[in-house]
Amino acid sequence: MKPENKLPVLDLISAEMKTVVNTLQPDLPPWPATGTIAEQRQYYTLERRFWNAGAPEMATRAYMVPTKYGQVETRLFCPQPDSPATLFYLHGGGFILGNLDTHDRIMRLLASYSQCTVIGIDYTLSPEARFPQAIEEIVAACCYFHQQAEDYQINMSRIGFAGDSAGAMLALASALWLRDKQIDCGKVAGVLLWYGLYGLRDSVTRRLLGGVWDGLTQQDLQMYEEAYLSNDADRESPYYCLFNNDLTREVPPCFIAGAEFDPLLDDSRLLYQTLAAHQQPCEFKLYPGTLHAFLHYSRMMKTADEALRDGAQFFTAQL
């Protein structure tokens, strides 16, 4: 699609979203568009520091978790000693960027609003790790904490998965992996999915939306996919194209959040319509005027804070 035919997104977004887009960090170097992935990761971490400031203070603990691929770092956020459940958080970043620091505020707010223990899993990024390594690391971490729940004083009788963007795909894929392979890590009470991608290769929103402002042009999406997958056949795997999985039975309750001007919005709409058509418990909420990744900006955006509260409320309602 010719770029000129796309929607004038930056003219259409909400006033608070425009404020975020126009917020400058004078001490930040330019985005290393032609740099290495390592340089882009470093920039992303630096850029997110401003947006992570002022998050709620709470007890935090770090553990290295053994997996067949090696040790994976995890971080526990404990808002209270008697947590009713444990939420595993998977960060976004196109499978190639992001870590526990870039999504620190999101995890802290989710823990605060849900009053549940939140465990961030620093899964190995691509292209160093190829599908399905990240999912297997996440599942290994769930199993580890389930086995060590008493020693670590966490409630693993009821768990959930949450994630944004690529992390949302990993969250739902991990829940389906546990179901399909009959792995017991506690009851999966809910899955919280903010503006994820779930397997569409083309859509109306992918045509109309996406640009330099969100890093989600068709070329960008192809680059993330090529970094993540091992081969072309993986595109049809039921743990990458989740619409190739069985979404008609035993899907945990899903909170599906969409951003109005996100090229991935149709992924969320299709997921919701599929689950709803088969009487699987789910809720869809569209956040008007927002861009992909708006969840990061709760320091400045009431809508981002609202989206986190909505997800937390949905999860606690399942307990």
From Swiss-Prot:
Changing D164A: Strongly reduces enzymatic activity. Changing G163A: Diminishes catalytic efficiency. A motif (Involved in the stabilization of the negatively charged intermediate by the formation of the oxyanion hole) lies at residues 91-93. It is found in: Cytoplasm. Its main location: cytoplasm. PANTHER family: AB HYDROLASE SUPERFAMILY PROTEIN C4A8.06C, ALPHA_BETA HYDROLASE FOLD-3 DOMAIN-CONTAINING PROTEIN-RELATED. This is Acetyl esterase.
